[in-house]
Amino acid sequence: MEAAVGDGEGGGGGGGRGKRGRGGGGGEMVEAVWGQTGSTASRIYRVRATGGKDRHSKVYTAKGIRDRRVRLSVATAIQFYDLQDRLGFDQPSKAIEWLINAASPAIDTLPSLDPAAFAAIPHAAADAAPTRRRSQQQQQQLSNKSGCSSTSETSKGSDKEVTVASAPAQAASFTELLIAGVAASSAGGGAIGNGADCVGIAHPGKGGAEGASTYGFSAASSFGDAPPIGMVPAPPFNFSAPGADMAAHYSLAQDQLAAPPPPAGGDYNLNFSMSSGFLGANRGTLQSNSPSNMSGHHHHHHQQQLQRLDGSTISFLLGHAAAAAHPAASEGQITSTAALQLWDGFRHSGMKEKSKN
């Protein structure tokens, strides 16, 4: 059991010894040193730096700082509470004061305490006050720093989240810029080589712009889908009707055609994809596409490519044009009949060379 000491008002008695009262600044309890009546030295030692309640404090004694709460044995606690009930006090401290006043004659016979033991108490209490203030200030500074650090850490975390969240947007915008640049360059290149990348097919039975059929495919629309070999554009074979100002274009670019799947193990792949090779020309630079720059080496290259084609494939591609070929041709232009004859001559010459070899 525990009994609190020094919670009540002063009881007096005992020739002024043990006299207690209120004094000092701030309403703190001041207890006179035993045998020194009216001393204002505070013997209360605050445990908490912020003060707190009186029951959380300790007191200065001749043997050092001690707790204000006293632990009693079971028998002593029973006797004490019985005495408190008989006295009619509602607080244990009042019963303790009554006992001290009643035992004052016996207390006078006891040896007095050494006054030198209490000489350092006022100085210790005075020194403890600045120490408490400094400790309070330090704790406040630490709490402020911890709050600022937590706030700064929170702000740092929020900055990181904003950066991470904005990173995909930046990456997306950069990708869009790249795509826009590629599209612009592809559009510019397509505009330059438009006439060279297309094959014009004319209807001999019609004249003017009506005899031209318009078939076009955009090579930039499927950029990246075609294999590397598909980047080779169509050769510059243009067949136009007489008097036509512009021939319609029919592009056979391989990037618009899907590559055939690979054959199974042990099987032969009989499929083929349409490319510029069927027309017997592989374009180099833009300047080499004009008919005036066709060299002998270019013709030899045509013959090698024509050897890979059989008669059925050629008749399939150009049979309709040969049947409906217009007999009249303007000067300086190659008609469809002349083109077929030239093509057939290339094929026969290639077959003869192959038979000789």
UniProtKB/Swiss-Prot annotation:
Which Pfam families does UniProt cross-reference here? TCP
Annotated stretches, region: Disordered: 1-29, 125-162, 281-307
Which keywords accompany this UniProt record?
Answer: Activator, Developmental protein, DNA-binding, Nucleus, Transcription, Transcription regulation
What is this organism's lineage?
Eukaryota, Viridiplantae, Streptophyta, Embryophyta, Tracheophyta
Q: Where in the cell is it found?
A: Nucleus
Q: What is the role of the protein in this entry?
A: Transcription activator. Binds the promoter core sequence 5'-GGNCC-3'.
Organism field: Oryza sativa subsp. japonica
Polar residues biased stretches: 142-155, 284-295
Q: Where is the TCP domain?
A: 52-110
Q: Does the keyword Transport apply?
A: no
Q: What GO CC terms are in its UniProt record?
A: nucleus
Bias (Gly residues): 7-16
Gene Ontology terms: biological process: regulation of secondary shoot formation
Q: What is this protein called?
A: Transcription factor PCF6
GO MF annotations in UniProt:
DNA-binding transcription factor activity; sequence-specific DNA binding
